[in-house]
Amino acid sequence: LSNEEVSLFIFCDYPSSRGWLETHGYEIFWTQISHQPFPLPTLFRHRTLLQREQHLREFEYIFHFDADVLFVGDIGSEILGEGLTATQHPSASYGNKDIYLGKDPKDIPLPVNSVDEPIWNLNQEWVSHSFEKNKKSKAFIPSEERKKYFAGAFQGGKSDLYIHAMQEMSYNIDTDLGQNIIARYHDESHWNRYLVDNPPKTILPFWYCFPEWEDWQSGVVAWKREVCVPEGKQVKMLCLDKDMHGGYESYRGNAKK
């Protein structure tokens, strides 16, 4: 977003960024939070962000990114829609090389800022594993509504709409906890439930939330080898493989290091 005025809100159990985080001249608003064992930090992410609600309301757009992502491509105004912005989960994607190779990028059926933009492919095994199936959970999605699946790592949109979404998801998560329920994929399950009822105006394709592996620059999704980034497109944001950066315990440890 090189043509936009951007401020960063960082939530961390470390007291400040001094000495270890390069801020690259951005305006930074730092909030120290308490360490919690996994999955509570991700489950409560919206509650955490809402600690800064009044300040966030001063901005036209709010976007949330996981801490373990790396921006590797230019992201521009295509993410700035008139409502919520959601990102296609790589496992719900379809992009066979035979479809894309040899085509002019402008002819690829993946226009920006259209709720129909990505090609979706949710196989039944993955659907049965990913969507919340507990009917008592506020994140439950019945089988007939399991048409799309969005990543939790990159989400946002117009400030008032996204704040309302965070408030409702936080309420639903607390309601679930009151019944001793944690959704299958934590806050991501609640995000997908919310988007069924409140469809996003802007859907970004899976290369805005691409899984890292040794050969990620090939554009092929490691665990879904038939899927690749179309010719003429580039990976925009890399979701880091925790095993390649110290291991899951360094991110999800139950004890403060």
Task: Indicate residue ranges for each PLM-predicted region.
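N-terminal anchoring/stem segment of glycosyltransferases
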Residues: L1-F44, Q51-E58, P230, E249-K257
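C-terminal helix/juxtamembrane-tail motif
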Residues: S218-K257
